[in-house]
Structures are given as C-alpha cells and as structure tokens.
Amino acid sequence: MRSQVSMSFDSADVAALETDGTWEAVILHEMAHVIGIGTLWSSSDVGIPGSQELYVDGSGQYTGATGLAAYQQEFVGQESATFVPVELGGGGGTANGHWNEGDGGFATGITRVSDGQDMNLMLMSGWLNGGSYISDTTLGSFEDLGYNTTLVLNAVPEPSSALLLLAGFMGISLHRRRA
C-alpha cells in the first residue's frame, strides 16, 4: 500500500519549543501520527479490509492486542486491564488520537513499573509535557498496525536448552529399551 504524508509546524512556536527542550518531542510525536498512531487505529476509517479494529471513535478504549499487552505489563495495577485508555478531552486533534491523561496534561496516577513516571508523560499523550518518553504501549500499537519493533514483552518461560536436551536423551533411552 502506498501513501503520501506531510507534516507542517507553526514556525511561530519553534523558538519557544527549542528553548524549553521540547521541539524534538513535538517532531517525534507528529511523526508517530503520520505513520499511524491515533490516525490508523480504525480500519473502517481508512478502508483497509480485513484489518484489526484497534479503536472505535468515542469509546476511549484502545484494544489492539500487543499495545494492550504492553500496557498491562508497563503500568502499575493494569495487569487485568481490558483496554488502553484513550483521550476523549481536548477537542479535535487531541480526542480519540492520544493516550489518556488529565485534561490539560495533568497526571493520571497511573505510573510505570520501571521508573514510576506517570502516563501523562508518554510521548503520545495529548498535551506536551517535558520529559516525554516513548512507551512500550506505543511500540505495541505500532506492532498492532503491522510495523516490526524492538518491543520485548514477558513471554511464557521456555525450558532451558539443557532441560530439553536431557528430556530428549531420556526419550531416546526409553525408546531403545522397548525396542
């Protein structure tokens, strides 16, 4: 599938964003939208038959499998979550296209297991906050959209090679004794 996209920025804001150190975050944030975060979550909106429906506008509930699994592991107390909360406030351009945070960029009280940072600091939340990070939840959403990422979720533990080798030798020994 081919597509053409563009990004444009209000040049009047660039100097202030550079001064406060958030210009790079703004560019990364907008690039993520360009390649699908919050813009290609609904296959019915973009006319891609057979695609997974990741989000229904107005629901506030992102349900993509990998993004949700990442959210469950990444944030404290979210192990049994059935969706990732999506922003419904802020109007057009913010609602339905960003991870949820308190309207105006305020903290949610949902914090990362790894470092205690609040969900409102995620790069793909709807309000610009200093110290933004690219969350595993966002990487999972990219995977849900079909991109390959470096996201590593906790998998079901596999037996060690030595244990598998030992089991194989035991199986061969038992087979030889019967024959």
For each feature predicted by the language model, list its residue ranges.
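Short, intrinsically disordered, low-complexity terminal/loop segments
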Residues: 178-179
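A short, hydrophobic C-terminal helix/tail in secreted or cell-surface proteins
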Residues: 157-175
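Extracellular zinc-dependent metalloprotease catalytic-domain scaffold
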Residues: 1-28, 33-155
